Amino acid sequence: MAKEELIEFGGVVSEALPDNRYRVLLENGVEIWAYASGKMQKHRIRILAGDRVTLEMSPYDLTKGRINFRHKS
C-alpha cells in the first residue's frame, strides 16, 4: 500500500502547550493542534508563540498536523 501524500500548510503558532504540542493558526484562518517533528525534538529546536512554521497534515484528519520547519524571524 502506497504512502498517502501529505498536505503542506503554512501558519503562525498562537500558543505553545505542554509536551511539544502547539496551537497553530493556518493561513486560511483555521486553528489546529500540531506537534514538533522527531528531528525538531531531537535537535531541540525551540518553537515559541508567534513563530511562522510549515506543517504537514494528513488528508484524513485536517484537525491535527506535524510541524516540520520553523522559519527565521
Swiss-Prot record:
Point out the coiled-coil segments of this chain. none
Which Pfam families does UniProt cross-reference here? Answer: eIF-1a
Q: Which InterPro entries match?
A: NA-bd_OB-fold, RNA-binding_domain_S1_IF1, TIF_IF1
User: Where, subcellularly, is it found?
Assistant: Cytoplasm
Q: What is its main location?
A: cytoplasm
Signal sequence interval, chain numbering: none
Superkingdom of origin = Bacteria
One GO cellular component term of this record is: cytosol
Which keywords, in A-to-Z order, does the entry hold? Answer: Cytoplasm, Initiation factor, Protein biosynthesis, RNA-binding, rRNA-binding
Q: What terms describe the molecular function in GO for this protein?
A: ribosome binding; rRNA binding; translation initiation factor activity
Ranges for domain S1-like come to 1-72
Function of this protein?
One of the essential components for the initiation of protein synthesis. Stabilizes the binding of IF-2 and IF-3 on the 30S subunit to which N-formylmethionyl-tRNA(fMet) subsequently binds. Helps modulate mRNA selection, yielding the 30S pre-initiation complex (PIC). Upon addition of the 50S ribosomal subunit IF-1, IF-2 and IF-3 are released leaving the mature 70S translation initiation complex.
Q: Which family does it belong to?
A: Belongs to the IF-1 family.
This protein's assembly is summarised as:
Component of the 30S ribosomal translation pre-initiation complex which assembles on the 30S ribosome in the order IF-2 and IF-3, IF-1 and N-formylmethionyl-tRNA(fMet); mRNA recruitment can occur at any time during PIC assembly.
Protein name from the UniProt record:
Translation initiation factor IF-1 1
Source organism phylogeny: Bacteria, Pseudomonadati, Pseudomonadota, Betaproteobacteria, Burkholderiales
Encoded by which gene? infA1
